[in-house]
């Protein structure tokens, strides 16, 4: 049985950058541009916590792509996993992401709200299978 428990999470970095050169196009409904990256850090000891870092970027390269702003939310979750061997990383990538994403979505919505923009940004539920792979790091 594979059991995953989210013990804690923290925002490593929350960045909001307004694009003051943004030129809205008339009658255009701007679609959200979302990029997801993840990194896993774990020890070889099964009882030790494992760490899943998620970086969500909304409107990447805002000035170049003519987006109104850019948000980067970098969040790390601390998990305990009941699984054996190499299955631990696969279990974390599949289940940990699903557990952590609602918190990341809320953080991003709050950033936009605090920026006092006229239109709220609420991210849709995100699909972990759309992730862009990042080289995993091994814990010391």
Q: Positions of the model-derived regions?
A:
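N-terminal intrinsically disordered, cationic/polar leader segments
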Residues: 1-98, 106-140
């Amino acid at each position: 049985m594979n059991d995953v428990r989210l013990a804690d999470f923290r925002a490593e970095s929350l960045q909001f950058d307004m694009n003051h050169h943004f030129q809205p196009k008339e009658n255009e409904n701007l679609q959200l541009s979302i990029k997801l990256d993840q990194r896993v850090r774990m020890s070889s000891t099964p009882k030790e916590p494992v760490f899943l870092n998620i970086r969500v970027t909304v409107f990447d390269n805002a000035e170049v792509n003519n987006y109104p702003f850019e948000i980067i939310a970098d969040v790390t979750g601390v998990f305990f996993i009941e699984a054996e061997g190499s299955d631990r990383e696969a279990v974390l990538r599949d289940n940990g992401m699903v557990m952590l994403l609602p918190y990341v979505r809320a953080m991003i919505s709050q950033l936009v709200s605090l920026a006092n923009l006229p239109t709220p940004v609420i991210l849709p539920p995100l699909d972990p299978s759309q992730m862009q792979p990042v080289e995993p790091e091994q814990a010391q």
